[in-house]
Regions:
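Flexible, small-/acidic-enriched active-site or ligand-binding loops
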Residues: 224-254
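A structural signal for short hydrophobic beta-strand segments in well-ordered beta-sheet cores
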Residues: 172-175
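Hydrophobic, small-residue-rich alpha-helical packing segments that form membrane-like cores
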Residues: 163-166, 181
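Structural signature of FAD isoalloxazine-binding scaffolds in flavoprotein oxidoreductases
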Residues: 97-106, 166-170, 251-252
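Internal helix-loop-helix
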Residues: 81-153, 192-198, 210
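A short core secondary-structure module
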Residues: 184-228
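N-terminal organelle-targeting presequences
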Residues: 21-67
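N-terminal mitochondrial targeting presequence
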Residues: 1-33
């Protein structure tokens, strides 16, 4: 039975022995919301699956992961087996094909298990979506299956030391030279850096100013000219600056 606000507060005033804290507790309990209200049976199942994974595979290990300051690769691969590595990507190369609401249900529940790991999973999914939406067929075929399964981790590289996350002001540049782009610049606060093997890097094409000059290339760990500077501890997870110095990337990586 729902207890009205006026009745609860009147009861508090009439009975001096009853504290207002208790009245507020009763009011909050009366108006609690079931997080599955309004969801379809399929969405409720998605929610239950993610919640069970968060409680059983993530929450018991929070302290250990925070102390190690590393992403739990074994648990991420279990998440990949459930389809959490490419939530809103096409099933063609391992994506789950969920819509944004369904994906939000998953990430919301995972956050109840470990917010740091869930935050990284959301970033990994951003990388998967960008590659699935804008990558060439060759790139999608070569990289999406391993990203979807978490066999390969992805990092989204936008933020820079001088411009923050203002995409229109970024300075990392790519200049055409023959069949390659020559990339120079730096990135900061890159989640997953050091454990990721695939980096979606936003950069400026041929020095073209403004937002229309921004495009993205896939950079793989180990490429000559790509280096990790150092890891930094943050409130949610760890992140690292990256340096790109005369990094050569084949032009076929751009979608044409």
């Amino acid at each position: 039975m729902v207890v009205s606000f006026s009745r609860v507060m009147a009861s508090c005033l009439r009975r001096k022995s009853r504290s207002c804290v208790e009245a507020q507790r009763r009011l909050a309990h009366s108006y609690s919301i079931d997080p599955s209200d309004g969801l379809s049976p399929e969405q409720k199942e998605i929610q239950r699956t993610a919640k069970s994974f968060a409680l059983n595979e993530m929450r018991p290990h929070i302290q250990e992961w925070e102390e190690q300051e590393l992403l739990p690769l074994d648990v991420l691969r279990k998440a990949g087996a459930l389809g959490f590595g490419a939530l809103y990507c096409s099933p063609d190369y391992g994506g789950s094909g969920l819509n944004r609401l369904d994906s939000t249900l998953v990430l919301e529940q995972l956050s109840s298990g470990c917010s740091s790991t869930a935050a990284y999973i959301s970033i990994h999914n951003m990388c998967a979506w960008m590659l699935d939406t804008y990558g060439s067929e060759a790139l999608r075929e070569a990289h999406l299956p391993s990203i979807a399964s978490f066999d390969a981790l992805g990092s989204y590289c936008l933020t820079e030391p001088d411009s923050g996350s203002d995409a229109a002001a970024l300075r990392t540049s790519a200049v055409k030279k023959g069949d390659y782009f020559i990339v120079n610049g730096s990135k900061a606060f890159i989640s997953g850096a050091g454990q990721s093997s695939k980096y979606l890097v936003m950069m400026r094409h041929e020095g073209e100013p403004g937002p229309k000059g921004i495009f993205c290339l896939l950079v793989e760990d180990g490429m000559e000219g790509f280096s990790l500077v150092r890891r930094r501890r943050r409130l949610v997870g760890t992140a690292s600056p990256l340096e790109l110095s005369r990094l050569r990337i084949a032009r076929f990586q751009c979608r044409t």
